Amino acid sequence: MIDGIKQLGSLSLTRGASGVSSLTESLFGGEQQSTPAQQTGASFASVLGNVSMDAMNNLKKAEVASFEGIQGKANTREVVDAVLSAEQSLQTAIALRDKIVSAYLDITKMQI
């Protein structure tokens, strides 16, 4: 059931990034402006990608544990732990989504 989520385009880390290079070319007249910068950590996109993948993995584990519990292969404690972990991941994803939507709405309300 949860495998259908992988097909969503919103989870693609590089979707929409192809137009960035053409935009910077048009802004800077074809010249590449380079400034020395140091990568101090993971990018925001990679962090969000990792969080979403962890959430999907937790949901998959909970789904498998639920099916095993129904079949009698897993005890109740394992099923409850997996479901609670999946619920926590889902709540984190919902909170993150709400913060992103709130930030977007704040930006759209700003005057130019």
UniProtKB/Swiss-Prot annotation:
Record bears the keyword Hydrolase: no
A molecular-function term among this protein's GO annotations: structural molecule activity
Keyword Nucleotide-binding tagged: no
Any one of the GO BP annotations: bacterial-type flagellum-dependent cell motility
Keywords assigned: Bacterial flagellum
GO-annotated cellular components: bacterial-type flagellum basal body
Coiled-coil segments on the chain, per record: none
Principal location listed in the UniProt entry: other
Compartments where located: Bacterial flagellum basal body
Pfam short name (any one): FliE
Family: Belongs to the FliE family.
PANTHER family in the cross-refs: FLAGELLAR HOOK-BASAL BODY COMPLEX PROTEIN FLIE (PTHR34653:SF1), PTHR34653
Name recorded for this polypeptide: Flagellar hook-basal body complex protein FliE
Organism from which the protein derives: Agrobacterium fabrum (strain C58 / ATCC 33970)
